[in-house]
Amino acid sequence: MASDELPVAAAATEEEDLVEILDEGSGRLDIARYVDHVRDLAAGAIATFEGTTRDSFEGRRVVELRYEAYGAMARRRLAAILREARAAHSLRRLAVAHRLGTVPAGEASVFVAASAVHRADAMEACRYVIDEVKASVPIWKKEVYDDGEVWKENREFLDRTTTDGTTASSPAPATRPAKGGGCCGSKVRANES
């Protein structure tokens, strides 16, 4: 190597990817820290996704979201999603973080960052990670309104399993599932009165 050339930095390994689940009371997501984590001299792009609590849904005022999780399983699934993203895209570094507990309107509940030599890989990986987080990580969301509350389904992913038992490669259209449908199908019974 000539004396004026810089060495090419090695890409981070999956062991160096950042996976965080912040327990209730841990405060806001540290967005700058996650972006700094994926920053890499060989990266030409950093793509991010920040999921925030909106202040209204279908005409109702949203006060906050409340998240619960099966922590150990959620952490394992998040790490697996990052491995899947690495296998599908040429990436330098990855980070994903999700808050648990109460997230007021206007604050971030989930953040994804990906760096790559080229923007397409970073952007596609970022989209893949957030889609899979919403589809397959055991984190549940309750939407709290000024006049009530409701546990939310992620409708766009409810019908990802096809009739032959395989998983569809893309999200299902955003439609309301048939009664008794959804991720758990007939395993969940709703008492209607």
Curated annotation (Swiss-Prot):
The keyword Membrane does not apply. Pathway: Cofactor biosynthesis; molybdopterin biosynthesis. Substrate binds at residues 118-119, 134, 141-143. It is found in: Cytoplasm. The keyword Aminoacyl-tRNA synthetase does not apply. Residues 163-178 have a biased composition (Low complexity). Keywords: Cytoplasm, Molybdenum cofactor biosynthesis, Transferase. It comes from the Eukaryota. It catalyses: 2 [molybdopterin-synthase sulfur-carrier protein]-C-terminal-Gly-aminoethanethioate + cyclic pyranopterin phosphate + H2O = molybdopterin + 2 [molybdopterin-synthase sulfur-carrier protein]-C-terminal Gly-Gly + 2 H(+). GO terms for cellular component: molybdopterin synthase complex. Transmembrane segments: none annotated. GO terms for biological process: Mo-molybdopterin cofactor biosynthetic process. GO terms for molecular function: molybdopterin synthase activity. It holds the Pfam family MoaE. Residues 159-193 are annotated as: Disordered. Heterotetramer; composed of 2 small (MOCS2A) and 2 large (MOCS2B) subunits. PANTHER family: MOLYBDOPTERIN SYNTHASE RELATED. Catalytic subunit of the molybdopterin synthase complex, a complex that catalyzes the conversion of precursor Z into molybdopterin. Acts by mediating the incorporation of 2 sulfur atoms from thiocarboxylated MOCS2A into precursor Z to generate a dithiolene group. Belongs to the MoaE family. MOCS2B subfamily. This is Molybdopterin synthase catalytic subunit. It comes from Oryza sativa subsp. indica (Rice).
